[in-house]
A protein has these predicted regions:
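Long, contiguous binding/interaction regions
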Residues: 1-174
Length: 174
């Protein structure tokens, strides 16, 4: 994909061997970006958590990463964005999460990744995709609004908004 500023990024499914690139990408994130995504501060992405995040069950999970195009003979470039979704136990809904490093934010990458995860959920014939967003995460709330998500309070979580997109009427062309 080509960003609004002309930079090219490689988008692909996450792989188990992405754990180290995921950790390198985590170091690009600002503390506030981490808090807004994980809903609590984290100083580092531990090797164990990186392994867990980079290993998915494709029967119920979906995850894409964005990185600069790989250079032959060089280590994998750091991952600068991740979107993931997991089908819930009811098999009718999926919960999504997304993070985009600040040097790549506001350039269409988040919208592109969200459209991809919505298409995956539609392909899986799910009824809804949803995510929990801190009410101060105005960028994510604005993106969700622009894609047709509805807002509700997350059950039992003060300061958290649940954004939901019913998929039978979803439009990913906005």
């Amino acid at each position: 994909m080509v960003l609004a500023d002309g930079r090219a990024l490689h988008i692909r499914p996450i792989r188990a061997d992405d754990a180290e690139a995921l950790r390198r990408g985590f170091s690009l994130l600002e503390p506030e970006e981490i808090r807004l995504r994980f809903m609590h501060p984290m100083r580092e992405l531990t090797p164990e958590l990186a392994r867990r995040l980079s290993t998915i069950d494709t029967r119920s999970d979906f995850a894409l990463i964005a990185c600069e195009p790989p250079t032959h003979g060089q280590p994998s470039p750091p991952i600068v964005a991740v979107v993931r979704a997991s089908i819930q136990t009811d098999r009718r809904r999926a919960e999504y999460a997304i993070i985009v490093a600040h040097p790549f934010a506001g350039l269409g990458l988040g919208r592109h990744l969200m459209r991809r995860v919505i298409r995956w959920a539609q392909y899986r014939r799910l009824d809804e995709i949803f995510g929990d967003v801190l009410d101060e995460n105005t960028a994510m709330l604005a993106l969700a609004d622009s894609l047709g998500f509805r807002r509700d309070r997350a059950p039992g979580e003060p300061g958290v908004i649940r954004v939901r997109l019913p998929l039978k009427r979803a439009s990913t062309t906005r």
